[in-house]
C-alpha cells in the first residue's frame, strides 16, 4: 500500500549517503517501480546472531553493504565500550577479510573491513587491520596472541559468490555465544544513523591507531603450529605426493607455508583454482563438502602427478576436506577420527607419564560422530560433546584451558578441525599440514589413510555415519514439519514417534524445547534454544539420528550414526540393513 511505499522511499532516501554503485542499484529499482525487489532489500534487517551476519551483497538493510557494515560495527563498538570501558582503547581489536567482491554493488570484503576499521578508529579504538587477505583462523589467533578485546572477520566462508558475512570473536579467542549476540544486536538497533566519521576510510592512511599485524601474525602462527610437527625427519624424506586446492579462496599461499613449516614436500596446487577469484569460475558452489563437482580438477591433477591424497580448503581456509587415493571419500567424521587418533598418538609419544592423561580433553559437536568418545573410554582421557557449531567448542575449550586442562583436539562433522588450542576455532591451514604429516608417516609404514581408518574402527569400534540435507526456503513448512514430530499422532499434547523403519525409538532429546527423556527430570543437559530446531532420536539398535535447521543456510540437515563393537567387520551389513532405516533416509 501507499504507507509501505512511503516507508520504502524513506529508507531509499537514507541510502543516498551510501556507496555510489549501491545507490545506482536502488535508483534503478525505484525508477522501474520494482516494489517487491525494494521490499526484499529494505523490508527486514539482517539478524545479528552468534554467527554474526551472512547475506547477499547488495542494497538495503537485508543485504551486506557499506551502510549495514557501518551500522553493525557502530553497534558492536558501542557494545564493546559497554563491556570493556577504557580497556577497549588500550587493547583494541583486529579486523581481517577474505577475497570476496560483488562488482555490481561495489561491495567487497576488503572495503567492508576498511569501513569497520574506520568506525573503530573514529571512537579512539586501536585497530589491527590485516593489509591483505587472510584465512579466518588468523583472526582468532591474533585476538589471543595480541591480547585484544575482540576480532572481526569479513567472510562468507563457503557460501555462494554473491554472499558475504561478518564474523565476531570475543576476547577469549572464541566466537561469541549468548548473551553477547543479543547485546550486540540491541546496540546495532540503537546506533543505525552513521556517525560523521564512519565513512572516512582516508583516516586509514595516517591514523596512529591503525596497525598492520600481517607479518607478525604470519610469523607467530607458523612458529606456533610447529609444536604439532613430530616427525620432521620422515617429512623431509617422504616421497608422498599430495594435491591441494583452495577453491579460488585465500588458502593457497598459507597452506604452502604450513607444509614448509613442517618440512613437508610442497603440495601440488590446482592451477585453475589456486589464486583468489570472487567469481569462483570453476565451481557451481565453492564448498568442498559438495564433493566431486568441486574436486574434479583436483582428481585430474592427482592422476597426472601420481598423487595419493587430495586436500581441499573452503574459500576462507577454516575447513578441510581429504580424499585418499583420489576418489575414496574420507568424510568429515572420518577425518575427525584420523586426526583425533593421530593427535593423541603424537601426544603419547611426548608424554609417557600416563597419569597426565586425566587432564587431556577432546571435544566434538553433538551431531558429529562419537568415535572420540570410544577412543577416550579406552585410552583414559576425557571426551565432551557440545551444541552444534565451533563457537561452543571454542568457548568450552577456553573454560578447560583456564582450569589448567589440555585440549588436544576438537572437530565437527562439517569438515571443521581444531588441532591444539592456539586457535579456538576450526583451522583448515594447520589441519592440512597435520594431515600431510600423518599421511607421510603412514606411507612410511606402507599404510594409507583409509587403511588406518579401518584399523581405528577395528580397535575402537565401527562408527558408520550418513549425513545430508534437504533444501527448504519456507520457514512455515520447516516449523510444521518439526511440530508434527513433536505431536506425532496427537495434536493435543507432546508425543514423539515411538519407532522408525521398524526399529524402536528408545530416547528423544529436543533441544528446541529443552526436553530429554534420558534424564531423570526430562530436562536436557545441553543448552536449549527455541529459535532453532533440533531433535535427536536414539534407537534400540544403537543408532542415533538428529534433525536440525541450519543457522546459515536454507537447509534441514540430518545426521545418522550406528556404532558396532570393536572388531565387528560386518559394517556394510549394519550400514544397509539398519542405518538406512533412520528417519533422514525415509
Could you describe each region identified by the protein language model?
Residues 42-62, 156-159, 242, 246-258, ...:
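Conserved phosphate/anionic-ligand binding catalytic regions in large, soluble enzymes, centered on
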Residues 569-586:
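Intrinsically disordered, low-complexity linker/propeptide segments enriched in Ser/Thr/Gly/Pro
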Residues 94-163, 258-322:
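N-terminal small/polar loop signature for handling phosphorylated ligands or for N-terminal nucleophile
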Residues 303, 307-309, 313, 323-324, ...:
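Phosphate-binding and adjacent anionic-ligand microenvironments
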Residues 169-199, 333-360, 364-378, 428, ...:
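Glycine-rich phosphate-binding loop plus the immediately following alpha-helix
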Residues 17, 37-46, 164-302:
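Gly/Ser/Thr-enriched, mixed-charge loops and adjacent short helices
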Residues 87-98, 241-244, 360-366:
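Short glycine-rich phosphate-binding loop at a beta-alpha junction
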Residues 6-116, 207-237, 250:
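An N-terminal, well-structured beta->alpha segment
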